Structures are given as structure tokens and as C-alpha cells.
Amino acid sequence: MACCSTSFCGFPTCSTGGTCGSNFCQPTCCQTSCCQPTSIQTSCCQPTSIQTSCCQPTSIQTSCCQPISIQTSCCQPTCLQTSGCETGCGIGGSIGYGQVGSSGAVSSRTKWCRPDCRVEGTSLPPCCVVSCTSPSCCQLYYAQASCCRPSYCGQSCCRPACCCQPTCIEPVCEPTCCEPTC
């Protein structure tokens, strides 16, 4: 795993203390994956250059584990939106790949606002989660890339004992994980 790699196109997998998966951040490293910086960093957990990768073309980060700017990435097209996200499945502002609902109507994925949140000890800026149904608190408030997945047309999940916190709006997370269906 690359230093401070991300999964989910922008959600950091870095833990606190500079641990990135099983690797500790080294003095220098080069991240070249789609959702990573493309330049060699003086400290892989403290990049200071403007990111130009395909998934983070205009992001400026003070820490690879702590993005501070709103993303305009190909993988997170709704992140410029910090408020006014849609509040219902398929109501305006939706983006492709809909599903056929129980009534037979096509229901598109919809943008949902995600407030400032804590992710593995680091902060993420306000963003939107693309979902067909209202995302869970786990997804909105504790959206750890290693634990949670966004809701794709109603299919949401959390890996057990990993996502939800005592202050979570929802009392428990799903005990098992499920795969997106669309």
C-alpha cells in the first residue's frame, strides 16, 4: 500500500499517528495512483503542493491524511456543494445509473450533504454523498473508507464494530456488509 493511500476516491485510509495501513509514512514518497498526489512529497503525510492527479486536480492539502480544501475531483463531483443538497431520491441534481424502484419508476442517485466530520482521527471538509436513499449516520459522520461504503441505490453497509460511535444518530451499524447493486 502506498504511503497515505486513499480509497473511495478521496476518503483517507490513514490512521492517526501517521500510520497508513501497515506502512508508516516515510520522509519521502511518491504517490501516483488516481486519487493520490502525483508529485514527490518532502513528507508523504504533509504534501504542500497543488495536487494534479485525475481525482484531485485542484486540491491543496496540508496533510495527506487531512484534506482541507473542497475537492473538485472526477471521483467526487459533488464536493463543491456544501449545502443545498437534494433531500430525496431522484429529485433533481441526480447523476446517472438509476435503479428501477418497487413502483417500476427509475430512481436516480441523489446528492446528500455530509457535514464536517471526523475520519480516523482526521477532519474532512463538508461534502456530499451520492446516494439513492438517505445515507446512514455512519456514512455521513463516520465515513471511514476502511469501514463504510456509500449507499448505492439503497444498498448501504458498515463492517461490524467499526463505524458507528456512541454519539451516532443511529444506535447501531449493520452487522454485515453488503455490496452495491447498481
UniProtKB/Swiss-Prot annotation:
Gene Ontology CC terms, in alphabetical order: cytosol; keratin filament
Domain of life: Eukaryota
Signal peptide range in chain numbering: none
Name listed for the protein in its UniProt record: Keratin, high-sulfur matrix protein, B2D
Keyword vocabulary terms for this entry: Keratin, Repeat
Described function: The keratin products of mammalian epidermal derivatives such as wool and hair consist of microfibrils embedded in a rigid matrix of other proteins. The matrix proteins include the high-sulfur and high-tyrosine keratins, having molecular weights of 6-20 kDa, whereas the microfibrils contain the larger, low-sulfur keratins (40-56 kDa).
Region (6 X 10 AA tandem repeats): 27-86
Alphabetical list of Pfam families matching this protein: Keratin_B2
InterPro entries recorded: KAP
Each Sequence repeat, start to end: 27-36, 37-46, 47-56, 57-66, 67-76, 77-86
